[in-house]
Each structure stands twice: as structure tokens, then as C-alpha cells.
UniProtKB/Swiss-Prot annotation:
GO molecular function, one term: structural constituent of ribosome
UniProt keyword terms in alphabetical order: Ribonucleoprotein, Ribosomal protein
GO biological process: one example: cytoplasmic translation
InterPro entries: Ribosomal_eL31, Ribosomal_eL31_CS, Ribosomal_eL31_dom_sf
Pfam families the record matches: Ribosomal_L31e
Lineage: Archaea, Methanobacteriati, Methanobacteriota, Thermococci, Thermococcales
GO CC terms of this entry: cytosolic large ribosomal subunit
Similarity comment text for this entry: Belongs to the eukaryotic ribosomal protein eL31 family.
Name recorded for this polypeptide: Large ribosomal subunit protein eL31
Subunit structure and binding partners: Part of the 50S ribosomal subunit.
Disulfide bonds: none
Organism this protein belongs to: Pyrococcus furiosus (strain ATCC 43587 / DSM 3638 / JCM 8422 / Vc1)
Coiled coil: none
Length: 95
């Protein structure tokens, strides 16, 4: 079930899923991309805007050791653009 526009939902993003796939020196940048993909998939959003605090939390312990899981609050809004239909935008902040 998709999140309705205007709703806020808390997700726990399992960042540890990428640890075996990605080399140590790429973990934090890949973790940011994983958060973006995870939220886009679960919120059914075309655009995901991540708060700088979420980025700082991922990078807090350096490039090699991102947190194994991260609780984030996601707010979904719909916006009309010229020449297009409505676009779903997900805003991600720390929970």
C-alpha cells in the first residue's frame, strides 16, 4: 500500500545489506544511494530529497563504517508541474 500524500511514516533502513556487496572505501556514499532507493521504492516516489542531517548521520563514523540501520521519517507530497502529471516527492529526515 502506498503512502498517501501529506502522510508521515517512519522507516528503518537496513544499510547493512550493502556491506558485503560494496568495498569498504565506498560504503558511506553507497549507503546514501541505498537510502534514496529504499525510500523511493517504499514510498512510490519519483523524487527523494534527503535532509543534510541524514547525510551527516551516515558519514558520522567515516567512509568505511556507516550505521547498520537508520530510522528515518518520510513525508510524501504531490506536486503538479508544467506539462507533466503530478509528481510524488518524498522528504527524508531523521526520526
Amino acid at each position: 500500500m502506498a503512502i498517501k500524500a501529506g502522510e508521515e511514516v517512519i522507516f528503518t533502513v537496513p544499510i547493512k545489506k550493502i556491506k558485503k556487496i560494496v568495498p569498504r572505501w565506498k560504503r558511506a556514499p553507497r549507503a546514501v544511494k541505498f537510502v534514496r532507493e529504499f525510500v523511493a521504492r517504499h514510498a512510490k516516489a519519483q523524487e527523494v530529497i534527503i535532509d543534510p542531517k541524514v547525510n551527516e548521520k551516515i558519514w558520522e563514523r567515516g567512509i568505511e563504517k556507516p550505521p547498520s540501520k537508520l530510522r528515518v521519517k518520510v513525508k510524501v507530497e504531490e506536486e503538479k508541474r508544467e506539462g507533466e502529471e503530478t509528481v510524488r516527492i518524498a522528504y527524508v529526515t531523521l526520526a
